[in-house]
């Protein structure tokens, strides 16, 4: 069995994958062992037209080749030492997050318009390119823009703020506008190949829910919306885990009419979104350029809040 694992280096090496099946897999975006291993047999069958039993064998073989199997708690401890962190630019915010934005997990930033979600995403797209001793990962970023909020001018300012060449920084950020929810899902499918080959260390989806909300309004469409959103979030979770990248998603808030005390807002997306991110951060406006960040859900972090500032040069501590 160990011999077989060594021999399987490519999808064409998988048992049962001849030229025709390989072509179908590649056309559906399954160009790497990782992409196949991260999918369900149902997803592979649906996307390629391959019978479900064949898809099951192909997925199982890809997982075995990549040694996706039971691990001991000690293995997990060793793996956790490979988790890296990207600085936000604010020491306060980094401390709240246990050192910065983590790889191998999804971090959700949610809050109302103007609370700083997109500003942090821009800053992280710059900071991920910094050397590790400056809080970066010396990697590239992918920015999936669903609402047209990305601004290259802001990237330019932030790059200057951390002493990097703005043009070089912009060349290392791959931007794409997602035009609808199915396109958004297809983009992430493609990332399983792109991330592996291009030193990408950060994937931003800003915002993760807007297309799903617009395309599936009302209670009658809720089940379909949640099902698609669930698939999308699991794609992102697998991407983060398999390739050790940081995934940051933004989300809007909606008012809860049943809440009379405290903050009457909650993140859009219901229980599906509530369980997917590893870290959930609620952002809200304060006075002037100050913003408040609160960790509301993270198994490894205490709940708490802090203040940061949005300055001309980017995310910083308040003066």
Curated annotation (Swiss-Prot):
InterPro entries: AAA+_ATPase, DNA_recomb/repair_Rad51_C, DNA_recomb/repair_RadA, DNA_recomb/repair_RecA-like, DNA_repair_Rad51/TF_NusA_a-hlx, P-loop_NTPase, RecA_ATP-bd, RecA_monomer-monomer_interface. One of its GO terms (biological process) is DNA recombination. It comes from the Archaea. Keywords: ATP-binding, DNA damage, DNA recombination, DNA-binding, Nucleotide-binding. One of its GO terms (molecular function) is ATP-dependent DNA damage sensor activity. Transmembrane segments: none annotated. ATP binds at residues 111-118. NCBIfam families: PRK04301.1 (NF003301), recomb_radA (TIGR02236). Involved in DNA repair and in homologous recombination. Binds and assemble on single-stranded DNA to form a nucleoprotein filament. Hydrolyzes ATP in a ssDNA-dependent manner and promotes DNA strand exchange between homologous DNA molecules. HAMAP family: RadA_arch. Belongs to the eukaryotic RecA-like protein family. This is DNA repair and recombination protein RadA.
């Amino acid at each position: 069995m160990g011999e077989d694992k060594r021999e399987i280096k490519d999808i064409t090496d998988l048992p049962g994958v001849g030229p025709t099946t390989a072509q179908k897999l590649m056309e559906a975006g399954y160009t790497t062992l990782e992409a196949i291993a991260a999918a369900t047999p149902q997803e592979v069958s649906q996307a390629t037209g391959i019978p479900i039993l064949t898809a099951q064998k192909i997925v199982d073989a890809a997982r075995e080749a990549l040694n996706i199997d039971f691990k001991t708690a000690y293995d997990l401890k060793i793996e956790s030492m490979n988790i890296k962190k990207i600085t936000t630019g604010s020491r306060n915010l980094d401390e709240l997050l246990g050192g910065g934005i983590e790889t191998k997990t999804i971090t959700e930033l949610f809050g109302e318009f103007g609370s700083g979600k997109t500003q942090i995403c821009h800053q992280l797209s710059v900071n991920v390119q910094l050397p590790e001793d400056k809080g970066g990962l010396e990697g590239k970023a992918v920015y999936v823009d669903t609402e047209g909020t990305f601004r290259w001018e802001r990237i330019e300012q932030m790059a200057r703020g951390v002493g990097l060449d703005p043009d070089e920084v912009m060349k290392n950020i791959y931007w794409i506008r997602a035009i609808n929810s199915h396109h958004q899902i297809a983009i992430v499918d493609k990332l399983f190949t792109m991330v592996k080959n291009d030193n990408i260390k950060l994937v931003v989806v800003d915002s993760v829910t807007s297309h799903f909300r617009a395309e599936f309004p009302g209670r009658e469409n809720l089940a379909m919306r949640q099902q698609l959103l669930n698939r999308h979030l699991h794609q992102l979770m697998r991407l983060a885990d398999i390739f050790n990248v940081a995934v940051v998603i933004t989300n809007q808030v909606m008012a809860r009419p049943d809440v009379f005390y405290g903050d009457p807002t909650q993140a859009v997306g219901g229980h599906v979104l509530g369980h997917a991110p590893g870290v959930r951060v609620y952002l809200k406006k304060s006075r002037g350029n100050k913003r408040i960040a609160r960790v509301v859900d993270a198994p490894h972090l205490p709940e708490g809040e802090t203040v940061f500032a949005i300055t001309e040069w980017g995310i910083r501590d308040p003066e």
